Amino acid sequence: MKLNIMKISGFLLSLKSVIFINFFFRFKKILNKDLKIIFFYFPVKSYQDNIIELIDELKKEKNIEVILGYNLGSSDQVKKLDKTFFLNLGYLKYIKKIDIFLSSYVVYEFPESINKIYINHDISDAPWVNPENEKILIKTISKYNYIFLSSDIAISDLKKKIDKY
């Protein structure tokens, strides 16, 4: 019973977030044609301090609106910040017309955005997924417009994986 309540709660919170993000921020863009909307998504609990610092810097800019999405896996770290929305992974595709989508974790479905950015924090060539899922991961990564990697080792490893598939 508790699991069903969690699922229903997650659905309702995600639905509320999708509606609010799509209408409120679209309205803000109508009022300010130069406004750029950047959506940071935090699907898992991991080290995020450097991304939070980036968000704080971006919020100082005049024509940039930063919004944050989180789910149960990352709620403790993110939900207390300004302009945050609960959004389960499957609901990202319902977010429309944002300028930049950014995540430090590979997501397989994206919101409608001009630019999709993946920031990887691994500094080694450790496997990202099981070998049987690697092809799907690389295919998904190829959908990102920009990929930021933290070391030459990680860059070399990703190039090899892309060449392989």
PLM features: what roles do these ranges have?
Residues 1-43:
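Membrane-proximal basic amphipathic "stem/tether" segments
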